[in-house]
Structures are given as C-alpha cells and as structure tokens.
Amino acid sequence: IDRITTAAAQRLYKPELKEAFQEMIERGWMSLSSPIWANMGTERGLPISCFNVHVPDSIEDITHKLGEVIMQTKIGGGTSGYFGNLRERGSAVSDNGKSSGAVSFMKLFDTAMDTISQGGVRRGAFAAYLDIDHPDAEEFLNIKDIGNPIQNLFFGINVPDYWMQEMIDGDVEKRKLWAKVLESRQQKGLPYIFFTDNVNRNKPQVYKDFNMLINASNLCSEIMLPSSTDESFICCLSSMNLELYDEWKDTEAVKLAVFFLDAVLQEFIAKTEGNYYLASANKFAKRHRALGLGVLGWHSLLQKRMIPFEGMEAKMLTTEIFKYLQDKSEKATQELARMYGEPELLKGYGRRNTTLMAI
C-alpha cells in the first residue's frame, strides 16, 4: 500500500495526498485492480487492466496488432480486438490468392494467449469481437466448440439495430443465426452480445462530437471506448466499496479515487513512452485520459440494510448512489483539468477525462 500510494502522490506532484490515498485503501473504501496492486510504483509491468486493438485488413497491420497484444499481455493486461474490418473467408487478396477469413487470424491471437502470461502473474486472455452481419459470423460462433482449433479465446458478437429488427420481423436466415447465438450462450456462456447502436447512442458527448465509433468492448465486456488503427483503448480501473457507503459518502472519497486513477494513468503514460508496441495505447491514454471508477459490495449494502434486491427501495438507492458518484467524479475531473490542463481531445470541454465511471 505504501509503494502504491507514494507513487500515486508523486505522479500528481502532491505528496500530501499519500496519506489520504492510504487511508482509503486501508479502510476498504476503495478496491484496486490487480495490475495496480502488482505493478504501480515498480519498475516492472503496467498498472492498467484492459486493452483493445482495432485489427486492420492487411497482413502487415494484423501482425503489428498481434505484437501489440502480446506486449499488452506481457505487461499485465487483459486484451481484446475488433475484427470486423477483415475480409471474409474466400475473398480475393492482392497476390491473386484468397483470404482465409477473419476467424483464421483469430487463431494467431489464441496461440499467443496460450503462450504469454500477464506480467508473469496469470495466463493471457483475449476477447475477439465480430459483427453479426459479417459473412464469417457463423464460423465465428463455432469458437470453443469441441474439436475447434480455437479454444482459449473469449468472443463477442456485435448486433446493430437494423439486424435485430429484421430478425424480430421474421427474416428466416437471421432467426437461424440468432438461434445459434443463443444456443452458443447456453452451451459455452459465450458470445457476449454487444449492441453497437445502443452503445454509440449513449457514448460521451465528446465522442459524438468527433464521430468516434465504439466498435467493441474489452475482455470483460464492461468498457465502452473507441479504438482505431492508431489508437488502442485502455481501461484504468478501481472500485468504490458500497458495503461501506455510509462511511465514505460524506467525505472526499470519490474525488480522491478519481485523482488516484488519473495518477495511475500518468504512470502508464510515463512507462510506455517510446515503446513501439504500446504507442497506440500511449496515444489513447494521452488524448482521452479515460478512467473507470466502478463499485463492489452492492449486494452487501442491501443485505446489511435488509433491503430486497428487486424492490423499489433498492432501485431508489441505486439512483441515489450512482447520481452521487457521477456528480462527485464530474467535479473531480473539472478540478483536475484546472490543475493539470485538458488533454488534446477535451480542449474546451473543461474536464480532464473522457469517461469516469465503469461497472
């Protein structure tokens, strides 16, 4: 704890915050992500939980993104990738040959995860995302089947509004494919279902203003951030402990948590400067400074107060708590912007971070 809080205070050039950070962690008000525990304030690894890459449709770029994912895994992160730009199996390629399709390239990432460990702590993990209207979608849903060459990957299917509506309206082929999605979830617990239009309707205003599309989520499917060929999104995560909500709700805890995560992000930026395979993630971190302050212990708070999980009182408390978290974190990012400046993407927005909250 001392190592982590010292590093965070130093990154903010505010040594006086060390004690406050330490108190929050020791009291159990804030729970840190595994990479922060393992790597913050050390010379090894990075304190970031998750990464996502946008895989382009050329051999050179695919191999570069594979190298990026291997490096991200090596330094301690969970990884994911969007494969919707890859051409379908059997389509023509520039040397008069035929493409082996999006799913075949996922095998490279599957093999990498079987080989590389996350900062020497745990086996690598990767989630592949593909659009349901991609011609290789049916083959994609066979991942993890008995006998399938891909066994280690997690996978998510992207479903746009138009496709869902046509399926509901009775399109026979779409209904067959949707049945296969549901069957796969029943048998394997996968794919994640990612409703792309819904996600993009609810993304932060800055992403709407710059028309930045969110094409995929992360390994755990709780982060909604945009990636592109030259920017790979990262998740800078920790959680507030709702079981102890009554202890910290009238304190500066949420503000301190946002400050702490911004310090974690600053450490990531400093450590990845000049790293060839982490340049896209470094660029995203600098330009977006996206944070994900989540929660844990929600059920414990309800049990402690003897509140039924599905009752109206629980719903009202949910609204109260998350409104409080949002208000406090918004004020914190505005204060950070005044103290340290706005990043490139947020010039004129009066804030330091594109996102603040996660699950």
Located regions from the model:
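Extended catalytic cores of very large enzyme megasubunits
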Residues: 1-359
